[in-house]
Amino acid sequence: MRALILGLALVLAPLAAQAQSLTVVAADGKTKVLTAPDLADLPRAEVKVTLETGAKTYEGPILAYVLRAGGLPVGPKLHGDPLRAYVVMTGKDGFQAVYALAELDKDFHDDVVILADHVDGKPLPEKEAPWRLASGGDRKGWRSVFGLARIEVRMADAPAKPSTMDHAH
């Protein structure tokens, strides 16, 4: 029996570790895996979210700092081409939501988006854990990705350079 329990622990341990990790992929393909301990010391915030289901207070790391920990350009580094970036957030169930990268940066946007790990002073319910996105500025919960597992930055195509013929009258 002890061998069976040990065997199950060895099989399930990687799954538990995977469930407690967040993969961050930069636009150039560089990938960084963040774990709960990586996120534990990042600056945190509370966000009050009022949706049709009622008001709740979420708490967790500020997403801009999570992005920085994942090697993404935020703050003073977010200028020029990175302003064309958008972020695809994917939950463990495959649900996705999209944000503009600048929308997640407190230097560009007043609304704070967090990687919530608590709601109303308690850990998230299992269906939303280990993290979910929470934004006080959204009026609908459609971008509240539960069980956030992946953050991937993609670049919008650069606009074609206009030719002199495009401006002829």
Residue ranges of model-derived segments:
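Bacterial N-terminal signal peptides
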Residues: 5-14
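N-terminal intrinsically disordered, low-complexity segments enriched in P/E/S/T
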Residues: 18-169
